[in-house]
Amino acid sequence: MHVTQEQVMMRKMVRDFARKEIAPAAEIMEKTDEFPFQLIKKMGKHGLMGIPVPEQYGGAGADVVSYILAIHEISRISAAVGVILSVHTSVGTNPILYFGNEEQKMKYIPNLASGDHLGAFALTEPHSGSDAGSLRTTAIKKNGKYLLNGSKIFITNGGAADIYITFALTAPDQGRHGISAFIVEKNTPGFTVGKKERKLGLYGSNTTELIFDNAEVPEANLLGKEGDGFHIAMANLNVGRIGIAAQALGIAEAALEHAVDYAKQRVQFGRPIAANQGISFKLADMATRAEAARHLVYHAADLHNRGLNCGKEASMAKQFASDAAVKAALDAVQIYGGYGYMKDYPVERLLRDAKVTQIYEGTNEIQRLIISKYLLGGT
């Protein structure tokens, strides 16, 4: 894929910002597991929170490839910050940009694009993970408002976000065709944030429960029409999956970089361990998988950029890159030996952060199912 001068400049700017601002913040996040509010504000001031948002709504007006470049570079330094940005943009802002009316766009997107507000995506429920069409949260219209009742779990940016793209049943007897999408503001009466989950990795990125107890959402906050919700969710998951693939690619490349440096410096039996085929072959395989993942990620991003169907390619990129990230992190820990198991060394964190990329935004089993349906004519 040809990279434009603008994309090269974007990559350099993000890389410099990540090393200067994100790296030290990531160390604090790892120790405290606290959300990096001040860092997000800085990212907003640098134009990173609205990269693909048109300038008329306060964004940078860049393309999807530039946005994916940013997630990729940030995730090399901090996968936690990478997922905060990915969820905010791909599924917290884009649903309004793609499916909102002009009034909704003008009301919400400028604050999201500037980083003054943070976005989240509330789809997953205790009883519906991979089966996104089996929601139980309901939205009953009454006196010009929708009353939402139910709960969501595993919501990235939960408790930190100002805007939640929320999915609920307006016609429970119609299954997925009865799902609608709503813009829910954080101070909505009847809406509360539940417990914050304690996770294996991605420290500092909030993952929470959301509770709706007759939450009063104005009729004006319905996205699209009643019954459009499932389509809205699935349409935005494509770019969301490319974003997670870029996050995984960043992890894989970071693991490779650390492993190469360590293998060249660590001396055993009178020579660097990189001189041993058992190590050098691991590094070669890590590099090959990372390069293959990079091509899949940017091919999918380029297709999306050109308005072409990228469902299969997004799933391929997400599945392959996340598998590559986990394998790279595992191999990096092995190359580090006992040091790799210790929190004082970076590869331990990479391994913990990598695992979830195989799970969220659709498990890799779901990705393989999607790919096979494209191949067999099921979509």
Curated annotation (Swiss-Prot):
Task: Kindly give the InterPro entries that the UniProt entry links to this protein.
Answer: Acyl-CoA_DH_CS, Acyl-CoA_Oxase/DH_mid-dom, Acyl-CoA_Oxase/DH_mid-dom_sf, AcylCo_DH-like_C, AcylCo_DH/oxidase_C, AcylCoA_DH/ox_N, AcylCoA_DH/ox_N_sf, AcylCoA_DH/oxidase_NM_dom_sf
Protein name as annotated: Acyl-CoA dehydrogenase
Q: What protein family does this chain belong to?
A: Belongs to the acyl-CoA dehydrogenase family.
Task: Offer an example of a GO molecular function term for this protein.
Answer: acyl-CoA dehydrogenase activity
EC number(s) per entry: 1.3.99.-
Q: Which domain of life is it from?
A: Bacteria
Report which reactions are catalysed by this protein.
Answer: a 2,3-saturated acyl-CoA + A = a 2,3-dehydroacyl-CoA + AH2
> GO CC: one term?
cytoplasm
Gene that this polypeptide is encoded by: mmgC
List, separated by semicolons, the cofactors it needs. Answer: FAD
Q: What induces it?
A: Subject to catabolite repression.
Asked if the Swiss-Prot or TrEMBL record annotates the protein with the keyword Oxidoreductase, the reply is yes
Q: What Pfam family is a match, any one?
A: Acyl-CoA_dh_1
Q: Which residues form a coiled coil?
A: none
What are the UniProt keywords, alphabetically? FAD, Flavoprotein, Oxidoreductase, Sporulation
Species this protein is from: Bacillus subtilis (strain 168)
One biological process term in Gene Ontology: sporulation resulting in formation of a cellular spore
Record has Magnesium as a keyword: no
